[in-house]
Swiss-Prot record:
Function: Catalyzes the rearrangement of 1-deoxy-D-xylulose 5-phosphate (DXP) to produce the thiazole phosphate moiety of thiamine. Sulfur is provided by the thiocarboxylate moiety of the carrier protein ThiS. In vitro, sulfur can be provided by H(2)S.
Assembly with partners or alone: Homotetramer. Forms heterodimers with either ThiH or ThiS.
Name assigned to this protein: Thiazole synthase
Annotated 1-deoxy-D-xylulose 5-phosphate binding sites: G157, A184, G185, N206, T207
GO biological process: thiamine diphosphate biosynthetic process
Substrates-to-products reaction catalysed: [ThiS sulfur-carrier protein]-C-terminal-Gly-aminoethanethioate + 2-iminoacetate + 1-deoxy-D-xylulose 5-phosphate = [ThiS sulfur-carrier protein]-C-terminal Gly-Gly + 2-[(2R,5Z)-2-carboxy-4-methylthiazol-5(2H)-ylidene]ethyl phosphate + 2 H2O + H(+)
EC numbers on record: 2.8.1.10
Pathway annotation from the record: Cofactor biosynthesis; thiamine diphosphate biosynthesis
Keyword set, alphabetical order: Cytoplasm, Schiff base, Thiamine biosynthesis, Transferase
Gene3D superfamilies in the record: Aldolase class I
Enzyme active site: K96 (schiff-base intermediate with dxp)
Length: 260
């Protein structure tokens, strides 16, 4: 089980609801992933009136916990306003907070992120901040009152996997009581497994599943990878070595093998 802001969930795979070929494929992929938390963009929900109502109905049919996000926001004021609108629309105080600082890399504006997180926490929100892997930023978010921190593995949609393993490991070591979720940059099930092997509590995916040739099958693959990664972490992974270490015992080795 994994705890998000006082609520227990069995799935460690959070999934996004954008970019799918069709609404039906989105539903089937979310089910195949076994996801219990689904991120939803306020802009997607409110765009198009009736179309937004249909989309929201499809999400409700899944019986999942909705995590609204502030995707596309580039200023503190825009993000805070979007979060408040999302709370009213979706009836939840949970918000995945994004404040984008660069259009090319979609890197978070970490200064604005901390400012927005502080304001939203003070306004009663449970903030899930999307950030870089920088420890000092994560610690400021925790100091602001965030119970969850969501560092990227790599830029959004890049599918590069974990590019700074040491930094992510440091986050886990220094923030043992904080729920940590790798968010963005994962492109393959093996990337998700690697994040869980580092001790991260969960991963959040969208593009890697939505843009797969078979989104439903890929969702199932990620589900298995996340489960395998967590089991591996809990089982205790052996330490990496610089040199070989024989796994075959020398006791009982024929005597002529010892003759030089």
């Amino acid at each position: 089980m994994v705890n998000f802001c006082g609520k227990e969930f069995s799935s460690r795979l959070l999934i996004g609801s954008a970019l799918y070929e069709s609404p039906a494929i989105m539903q089937d992929a979310i089910r195949a992933a076994g996801a219990e938390i689904v991120t939803v963009s306020l802009r997607r929900e409110t765009a198009g009136g009736k179309a937004g109502d249909v989309f929201w109905s499809l999400i409700r049919e899944l019986g999942v916990t909705v995590l609204p996000n502030t995707a596309g926001c580039r200023t503190v004021r825009e993000a805070v306003t979007t979060a408040r609108l999302a709370r009213e629309l979706f009836g939840t105080s949970w918000i995945k907070l994004e404040v984008i600082g660069d259009n090319d890399t979609l890197q978070p504006d970490v200064v604005g992120l901390v400012e927005a997180a502080t304001e939203l926490v003070n306004d009663g929100f449970e903030v899930f901040p999307y950030c870089t892997e920088d420890l000092s930023v994560a610690m400021r978010l925790v100091d602001a009152g965030c119970k969850v921190v969501m560092p990227w593995a790599a830029p959004i949609g890049s599918a590069r996997g974990i590019t700074n393993r040491d930094a992510l490991r440091l986050l886990r070591d220094r923030l043992p009581d904080i729920t940590l979720v790798v968010d963005a940059g994962l492109g393959a099930p093996s990337h998700a497994a690697a994040a869980l092997e580092l001790g991260f509590d969960a991963v959040l995916l969208n593009t890697a599943i939505a843009k797969a040739a078979d989104s439903v099958a890929m969702a199932g693959a990620f589900k298995l990878a996340v489960e395998a990664g967590r089991i591996a972490y809990e089982s205790g992974l052996m330490d990496a070595r610089d040199f070989a270490s024989p796994s075959t015992p020398v006791i009982g080795t024929p005597f002529w093998h010892a003759v030089s």
